[in-house]
Amino acid sequence: MPKKVKPTGDENEEESVPCKQVKEELPNTLSVLNFDSPSSFFESLISPIKVETFFKEFWEQKPLLIQRDDPSLAAYYQSLFSLSDLRSLCSQGLYYGRDVNVCRCIGGKKKVLNKDGKAQFLQLRKDFDQKRATIQFHQPQRFKDELWRIQEKLECYFGSLVGSNVYMTPAGSQGLPPHYDDVEVFILQLEGRKRWRLYSPTVPLAREYSVEPEDRIGTPTHDFLLKPGDLLYFPRGTIHQAETPSGLAHSIHLTISTYQNNSWGDYLLDSISGLVFDIAKEDVALRTGMPRRMLMNVETPADVTRKLSGFLRTLADQLEGRKELLSSDMKKDFVMHRLPPFCVGNGTESMNPGGKLPRLNSIVRLQFKDHIVLTVGPDQNQSDEAQQKVVYIYHSLKNERQTHMMGKEVETEIYGLRFPLSYVDALKQIWCGSPVRVKDLKLGTDEEKENLAVSLWTECLVHVL
């Protein structure tokens, strides 16, 4: 039998309880966006811009401003977060630094006005009104169901973690100095109006956050006001600053961000070590020792550089001919830290298998495909040097919504299964998404076929038709 990566409840496969069904609709929702699928959601989010146009002309290239005069969309945006929400959330135990920051831009520098310990709404409101401070609320999708719904769809669409922050800024004030981020940014204006100024990047597609002094950024490439219902996108590295104009009401905007450390360079760093390890098993040249005292050289000798270049060409040639799934810590990290499937409620209820137990003549189909990754790697349970490769299936069905995007200091668990490498073809049959009869799975025995189906069913990864 395959083994679980992490125990996830009762392992008695013959017993079942009603499955906790994921709900796709919020009751009495104001939503004017299309949540039918990740693709339809993103299409409705950037409407009237076509998706093809967005990725061809704007994504990672230049900002996109979408200004709308749509009262229903403006009302929906306003429903996503408000100052009254902040009052109710403070009663749940918010802390400075972890959940909220209070800050103001003074003389081109960020001044943090946080207190210690728990955040009280009256103190936050006092700083907001009297000190004209911006209140930054971290990762509101932990508390607001509709933001969970939005970001879960976006994580499915991009295949990358999606975070968010809410910024509440009083009139005549600015929270942050000019800076650029290491993420792709979508701005949704929820309440009031905000003046945005964007500048050409000094570091295109930046990998780090950085504050830029006013004398370095030049003149704005864009200067405009956002109003409720408007959407702004800009690539990582875009220098920006935003302020609420004097004489107007306060402003609230939502920042949705994605694609942090999600470049080709990151993927290469993630996959190259496994590739070298595999090829070194077959190529004795990679197992020969380095020249004596090479690590003691101040500079790398030319012959060593040529040797390394030759090894890299060998790796490239070997990579092109490989069809095997590459082990990837990026895959594991994504599924481990992303949001669970959206459902109404607090999101902490575990999902349990329900319905018919799959048998040899049953027809099964994969579910929650966007929440599952399949990868091949060495068996971590083997301590000997000759580790056998196994297939790992990781999923996010039992992830904790409350810890989403809260940093590495929060302990997270990884859920899933591991199977012998001989199961990979049968798993690919199921992963295509079409219904498949259990007895038609590409495995050697009927017992293996049924065990595979039951194991996936126990984790709610397949259902019986």
Swiss-Prot record:
Phosphoserine: modified positions: 309
Gene for this chain: Riox2
A Pfam family annotated for this UniProt entry: ROXA-like_wH
Phosphoprotein keyword on record: yes
Location of the JmjC domain: 139-271
Keywords: Dioxygenase, Iron, Metal-binding, Nucleus, Oxidoreductase, Phosphoprotein, Ribosome biogenesis, Transcription, Transcription regulation
Name of protein: Ribosomal oxygenase 2
Functional description taken from the UniProt entry: Oxygenase that can act as both a histone lysine demethylase and a ribosomal histidine hydroxylase. Is involved in the demethylation of trimethylated 'Lys-9' on histone H3 (H3K9me3), leading to an increase in ribosomal RNA expression. Also catalyzes the hydroxylation of 60S ribosomal protein L27a on 'His-39'. May play an important role in cell growth and survival. May be involved in ribosome biogenesis, most likely during the assembly process of pre-ribosomal particles.
Protein species of origin: Rattus norvegicus
Subcellular location: Nucleus; Nucleus, Nucleolus
One annotated GO biological process: ribosome biogenesis
One GO molecular-function entry: histone H3K36 demethylase activity
GO CC term (a single one): nucleoplasm
EC number(s) from the headed UniProt entry: 1.14.11.79
Cited SUPFAM superfamilies: Clavaminate synthase-like
Family assignment from sequence similarity: Belongs to the ROX family. MINA53 subfamily.
Residues engaged in binding Fe cation: 179, 181, 240
Cofactor(s) demanded: Fe(2+)
Reaction catalyzed: L-histidyl-[ribosomal protein uL15] + 2-oxoglutarate + O2 = (3S)-3-hydroxy-L-histidyl-[ribosomal protein uL15] + succinate + CO2; L-histidyl-[protein] + 2-oxoglutarate + O2 = (3S)-3-hydroxy-L-histidyl-[protein] + succinate + CO2
Predominant subcellular localization, coarse grouping: nucleus
Residues of the signal peptide: none
Gene3D superfamilies reported for this sequence: 3.90.930.40, Cupin, JmjC domain-containing ribosomal oxygenase (ROX), dimer domain
Cofactor note: Binds 1 Fe(2+) ion per subunit.
